[in-house]
Amino acid sequence: MAQKDTLLHLFAGGCGGTVGAIMTCPLEVLKTRLQSSGLTLRPVFQVQLGTLNGAGVIRPGSVTPGLLQVLRSILEKEGPRSLFRGLGPNLVGVAPSRAIYFAAYSKSKETFNGIFVPNSGVVHMSSAGFAAFITNSLMNPIWMVKTRMQLEKKARGEKKMNALQCARYVYKTEGMRGFYRGLTASYAGISETMICFLIYETLKKYLAQSRFTTPDTDNDKGASDFLGLMFAAAFAKGCASCIAYPHEVIRTRLREEGSKYKYFFQTARLVAVEEGYAAFYRGLIPQLIRQIPNTAIVLSTYELIVHLLAEPSK
């Protein structure tokens, strides 16, 4: 029975992740481009008044292109297909990634329920942290290839590397260690997962006791139940992303080809000194636009499949 439950969570997690990845891929590409240090900054001139002789001083400056500007640039120079760059390795990675995550989450929750107060916040955070650690450690090479493909800029019509070619290039130029660039930043991002699932499980428990849940048994869930879970997942991910977003920027910088960014704290220091603290939130808007519906789709699909395929409780 335990093995069957694990397989169910593996399957449900893989399906949820696949659906979410396909539907939100263009926003993933936009977010990665905005996070990158290779983003072209638009030059501006700042006028500073109040000098000793009363004259103004014109200082050169720069403005980070917005979401729509980056989207327009990609469509004009690279074509609409570039909005799906990295989808191949993303699909190859997201199904096993989500499958591993949800299977590890459900199993670790069983274990932690026997150690701490059952279904408490500590249990949810510990389970989410453990599952994220396992998933990040196993899947980082695939996410590394996906990020490199999304950062590759080629004019419309120019041949671009596929996932296998990109993986070979990374291995040839950087060796096996190259596939694990950004892993420390991914570990730092475990805090985001812990916050997200703490909020989600809390809201899920509240919804189970509220008017959104049908008054019948757990096996008679209606559309309103899953709609409520989608809103809970969206809210949880939005809060967690805003709190822990800087690690995403650091991770993208660490995965850039031939970059000056070598280690987590060295990268954080360089970004802060050279670009200011606002740079840690570059790409936040497309991240929220992508991650909120993506998480809502993934979790609600996962919950739906588990509900449909799980054996009725006696």
Curated annotation (Swiss-Prot):
The keyword Membrane applies. The gene is slc25a33. It comes from the Eukaryota. This is Solute carrier family 25 member 33. SUPFAM superfamilies: Mitochondrial carrier (SSF103506). InterPro entries: Mit_carrier, Mitochondrial_sb/sol_carrier, Mt_carrier_dom_sf, SLC25A33/36-like. It is found in: Mitochondrion inner membrane. Belongs to the mitochondrial carrier (TC 2.A.29) family. GO terms for cellular component: mitochondrial inner membrane; mitochondrion. The keyword Hydrolase does not apply. It is a multi-pass membrane protein. GO terms for biological process: mitochondrial genome maintenance; pyrimidine nucleotide import into mitochondrion. Keywords: Membrane, Mitochondrion, Mitochondrion inner membrane, Repeat, Transmembrane, Transmembrane helix, Transport. Mitochondrial transporter that imports/exports pyrimidine nucleotides into and from mitochondria which participates in dendritic cell endocytosis. It comes from Danio rerio. One of its GO terms (molecular function) is pyrimidine nucleotide transmembrane transporter activity. Solcar repeats lie at residues 4-111, 119-206, 224-308. The chain crosses the membrane at residues 7-27, 44-58, 114-134, 183-203, 226-246, 291-311.
